[in-house]
Amino acid sequence: MARCRHHSGYLADDEAAHGTYVARLPKKHLLPEMRPTCKLGRVPHLPSMNRYSERQGHQQNLRRPRAFGGFLDFLTEGQVLDSLQTVVEQATECVATMKTEAGVPLVDVQDRVEVPNSRHRSRGRPSINTVHRHRARPTLCAGHPNNYPSCSSSMSDSHSSVTAGWLGSRSQDSDLGARGVGSLPPMRDKLLLEKNLKRLLRLESKGKVLNQHCSQRDSLLWDSLGSQSSSQPTREQPLSWFSGLLASTSVTPETSELGLGEQEMIFLKQELNKEIKSLLNQPTSFNLPTYCPLREPHRTLDFLSEHHLFPALQRVVSQAVDKLSHACRHNGFPLFPVTSELSPVFPGNSDLQPSSKASLPTDREARGETCYSPTSASSPKTSHRKSKDRRGSPSNAVQMATRFRLKVTPTEVSNVPIPSSQCMLKSPNSDLKLQKQTTASNHNHIPQPRHGLHLTLPAPGITVEVASCQGQLRGQVQHSLATPCHLHSHFPFPVFSPFLPLGKSFSTSPPTLCPEVSSRAGLEVLEGHLKGRGCFTHHF
């Protein structure tokens, strides 16, 4: 037990470990002999190597236990604290001269006894007067047991023990030193906190100066973003003293425990804050006009109309609607089922495309309809009924509308006798077979390749052919042969004369050839040439 006690080098540790005995204290008659050695800076007590003496001292301590205050008295009377103070001053001087890579002192040492209330902080070793005053009046430092070295420890052991005690946690030494009673300097943690506080105050004052001119302009933006005000220190400023040594990285120690996704989000948020700050520091970014909800839509519409962007937007929307209307699900059913297929209207198109406004009749055409129909085939009652049907059912007119195609090619003169119009009027329901045979024989005797004027109507299986001739008329012809052609050129669905039976063929001879016509104007011109003279064939 004695070996462990002397080997540890700390009487306080031995005192705490062995509660049945008290550490052996030197006798009074040894104190006068030890005083000269104390002046030389040597530790007075040496460990005893005699086991008998150790055993005898141990038994003596068991008989007469002494208080721990006797050891403190020994430290005070033997001026052991003086040597401790010297060691601490040397360590303090070494630490005070240490600097970082940036050239900044690592710690700031303050002599609180010399200048207790002054703002000026002295760096380095305390003055000689302070040291002598402390040595002349040594005081007790009540702290942790490890702060007191044993008499058996050497100079290096005492230095290490003092350093270990000085670098420990906060104790009453700093409080006593703050009141000017103790001789030890304040703890390292307190010094570093004070230095960090001074650095933060300096950064805060610098930030106030920099952000003072921007606080009024970006107050609305920062309030909307929910950020902190410019008077408060930013979160990016580190709160630990070693962050200055590590270039003051903005990543806090808590981020190392977070996941990769959270770290990435924090990094992106910091980058966004930097970008916002850089934009706010630019004076040109605040020259933009303020947003007014009552004025901005008007400006947007003006911009679109000035640059003719409405047709482009309409095309884009139409394409999007087209794609969505034809979109299908995984099972093949349409994504948006539509009962009536109505395509968007494109005005300004000369071609009579499906579901276009150009294919719908107008009042002018309805008025011109009576002018071109001299017979009873298109009476006012009939035209009124047709126009009423057109206006009443716009969806049917849209569905029936299609593209007109006309082709004209000359054919050979036929010698078929032409029946009179009176016979046609008297017997409107003549034999259909005879007329079909006559038409077939006429087609068989054409020596040249036959080309015709084809008028494709929206109803399935309906075709109107107009073939040119140079002779007499073929088939049964009425006086109002031009009426069906005129009606076809104006209406998107076929209109026939009540005197013309379905399935009949009729022909006239136009004077000139007309190319393919796809517009309403072309049909009207063609009608003028074919009026009264032409070959029309209507098939179901």
Curated annotation (Swiss-Prot):
Pfam families cross-referenced by the UniProt entry: DUF4702 (PF15774)
Key words, A-Z: Coiled coil, Cytoplasm, Cytoskeleton, Phosphoprotein
Modified residues (Phosphoserine): S393
Compartmental location: Cytoplasm, Cytoskeleton, Microtubule organizing center, Centrosome
Regions of compositional bias (Polar residues) in chain numbering: 350-359, 372-381
GO CC list: centrosome; cytoplasm
Region of interest called Disordered, as start-end residue ranges on this chain: 347-400
Upper taxonomic lineage: Eukaryota, Metazoa, Chordata, Craniata, Vertebrata
Annotated protein name in UniProt: Coiled-coil domain-containing protein 116
PANTHER family cross-referenced by the UniProt entry: COILED-COIL DOMAIN-CONTAINING PROTEIN 116
Coiled-coil ranges per UniProt: 79-102
Organism of derivation: Rattus norvegicus (Rat)
